[in-house]
């Protein structure tokens, strides 16, 4: 499982001109699922997302996690994160999970996140989404489990 994590002032996802998810301060996370990913890897990813200390404390040091700042978590499925770009100019997507597996694991991640934290919003698996955000910093990390 691969995630691009961005600290944001606010972020949202629209599908067909309707908002499917939006947060204020928090983390906007693009999530890619590999064919061999498991619920255990999704659990590890959630642990990292909730615990990653990327928000500033009173001294201005990145020392607080999303829960400590009562921030939101916007989870957006994105199979293109798993693309292979090492050969040629056309990305290959063999590294992405088949849709049924990818959706099941993304849904599992979302369910676990909602169980652990009340401020969770999502994009829509398989949809053409428009994602907007105000990146804070910018602070961006790539995490793999």
Swiss-Prot record:
Assembly and oligomerization: Homodimer.
Organism: Chromohalobacter salexigens (strain ATCC BAA-138 / DSM 3043 / CIP 106854 / NCIMB 13768 / 1H11)
Enzyme Commission number, as recorded: 3.1.1.96
Domain notes: A Gly-cisPro motif from one monomer fits into the active site of the other monomer to allow specific chiral rejection of L-amino acids.
Keywords: Cytoplasm, Hydrolase, RNA-binding, tRNA-binding
Subcellular localization, as worded in the UniProt entry: Cytoplasm
GO cellular component, one term: cytoplasm
The organism's taxonomic lineage, starting at the top: Bacteria, Pseudomonadati, Pseudomonadota, Gammaproteobacteria, Oceanospirillales
GO MF annotation, one: tRNA binding
Name this polypeptide is given: D-aminoacyl-tRNA deacylase
Catalytic reaction equation(s): glycyl-tRNA(Ala) + H2O = tRNA(Ala) + glycine + H(+); a D-aminoacyl-tRNA + H2O = a tRNA + a D-alpha-amino acid + H(+)
Major location category of this protein: cytoplasm
Function, as annotated: An aminoacyl-tRNA editing enzyme that deacylates mischarged D-aminoacyl-tRNAs. Also deacylates mischarged glycyl-tRNA(Ala), protecting cells against glycine mischarging by AlaRS. Acts via tRNA-based rather than protein-based catalysis; rejects L-amino acids rather than detecting D-amino acids in the active site. By recycling D-aminoacyl-tRNA to D-amino acids and free tRNA molecules, this enzyme counteracts the toxicity associated with the formation of D-aminoacyl-tRNA entities in vivo and helps enforce protein L-homochirality.
Keyword Hydrolase: yes
Motif (Gly-cisPro motif, important for rejection of L-amino acids): 137-138
Xref: InterPro entries: Daa-tRNA_deacyls_DTD, DTD-like_sf
Enzyme class: hydrolase
Database matches in Pfam families: Tyr_Deacylase
Protein family: Belongs to the DTD family.
Biological process according to GO: D-amino acid catabolic process
């Amino acid at each position: 499982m691969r995630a691009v994590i961005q600290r944001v002032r606010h972020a949202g996802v629209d599908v067909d001109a309707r908002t499917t998810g939006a947060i204020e301060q928090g983390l906007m996370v693009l999530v890619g699922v590999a064919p061999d990913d498991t619920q255990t890897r999704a659990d590890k990813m959630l642990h990292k997302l909730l615990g990653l200390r990327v928000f500033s404390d009173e001294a201005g040091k990145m020392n607080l996690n999303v829960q400590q700042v009562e921030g939101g978590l916007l989870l957006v499925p994105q199979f293109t994160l798993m693309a292979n770009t090492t050969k040629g100019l056309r990305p290959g997507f063999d590294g992405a999970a088949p849709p049924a597996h990818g959706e099941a694991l993304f849904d599992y991640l979302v369910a676990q996140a909602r169980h652990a934290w009340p401020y969770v919003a999502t994009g829509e698996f398989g949809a053409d989404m428009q994602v907007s955000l105000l990146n804070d910093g910018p602070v961006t990390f790539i995490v793999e489990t």
